[in-house]
Amino acid sequence: MKAIIFLFAVLTVVAIIIPIISGEPNAGPHAASIDLNEIMKKITPDLLKMLDDIKTKIQG
Protein backbone atom coordinates (compact mmCIF):
# COMPACT_ATOMS: atom_id res chain seq x y z
CA MET A 1 0.00 0.00 0.00
CA LYS A 2 2.81 2.41 0.84
CA ALA A 3 4.38 1.71 -2.54
CA ILE A 4 1.18 2.75 -4.33
CA ILE A 5 0.94 5.98 -2.33
CA PHE A 6 4.64 6.65 -2.95
CA LEU A 7 4.26 6.09 -6.70
CA PHE A 8 1.19 8.33 -6.86
CA ALA A 9 3.00 11.08 -4.93
CA VAL A 10 6.00 10.87 -7.23
CA LEU A 11 3.89 11.05 -10.39
CA THR A 12 1.92 13.98 -9.01
CA VAL A 13 5.07 15.89 -8.08
CA VAL A 14 6.61 15.24 -11.49
CA ALA A 15 3.43 16.34 -13.29
CA ILE A 16 3.43 19.60 -11.33
CA ILE A 17 7.17 20.37 -11.37
CA ILE A 18 8.04 19.74 -15.03
CA PRO A 19 5.73 22.44 -16.51
CA ILE A 20 6.91 24.96 -13.90
CA ILE A 21 10.57 24.34 -14.68
CA SER A 22 9.88 24.43 -18.42
CA GLY A 23 8.73 28.03 -17.95
CA GLU A 24 5.05 27.58 -18.71
CA PRO A 25 3.16 28.20 -15.46
CA ASN A 26 -0.26 27.59 -17.03
CA ALA A 27 0.82 24.46 -18.87
CA GLY A 28 -0.34 21.00 -17.97
CA PRO A 29 1.87 17.92 -18.03
CA HIS A 30 1.10 17.42 -21.73
CA ALA A 31 2.80 20.68 -22.70
CA ALA A 32 6.10 19.70 -21.10
CA SER A 33 7.01 17.12 -23.71
CA ILE A 34 8.53 19.76 -26.03
CA ASP A 35 11.87 19.99 -24.22
CA LEU A 36 11.38 17.02 -21.93
CA ASN A 37 14.89 15.64 -22.47
CA GLU A 38 16.54 18.97 -21.63
CA ILE A 39 14.34 19.43 -18.58
CA MET A 40 14.99 15.91 -17.34
CA LYS A 41 18.75 16.42 -17.66
CA LYS A 42 18.45 19.47 -15.41
CA ILE A 43 16.13 18.08 -12.75
CA THR A 44 17.02 14.38 -12.60
CA PRO A 45 19.69 14.75 -9.86
CA ASP A 46 17.39 16.93 -7.75
CA LEU A 47 14.46 14.61 -8.40
CA LEU A 48 16.43 11.52 -7.42
CA LYS A 49 17.52 13.17 -4.17
CA MET A 50 13.94 14.24 -3.43
CA LEU A 51 12.61 10.74 -4.14
CA ASP A 52 15.26 9.28 -1.87
CA ASP A 53 14.23 11.67 0.92
CA ILE A 54 10.57 10.73 0.47
CA LYS A 55 11.42 7.04 0.48
CA THR A 56 13.41 7.30 3.71
CA LYS A 57 10.54 9.22 5.37
CA ILE A 58 8.04 6.53 4.32
CA GLN A 59 10.28 3.70 5.48
CA GLY A 60 10.73 5.32 8.86
Curated annotation (Swiss-Prot):
Region forming the signal peptide? 1-23
Keywords, alphabetical: Amidation, Neurotoxin, Secreted, Signal, Toxin
Q: Which GO terms describe its cellular component?
A: extracellular region
Glutamine amide found at: 59
Using the UniProt record, give the first listed, main subcellular location. secreted
Provide the tissue specificity: Expressed by the venom gland.
Record propeptide residues = 24-33
For whether the record's keyword set contains Ribonucleoprotein, the answer is no
Task: Write out the annotated subcellular location.
Answer: Secreted
GO molecular-function terms, A-Z: toxin activity
Please report which protein family the annotation says this sequence is part of.
Belongs to the formicidae venom clade 2 family.
Purpose of the protein: Toxin that causes a rapid and irreversible paralysis when intrathoracically injected into insects (blowflies). Does not cause spontaneous nocifensive behaviors by intraplantar injection in mice.
- State the protein's name: Myrmicitoxin(1)-Pr4c
Q: What organism is listed for this UniProt entry?
A: Pogonomyrmex rugosus (Desert harvester ant)
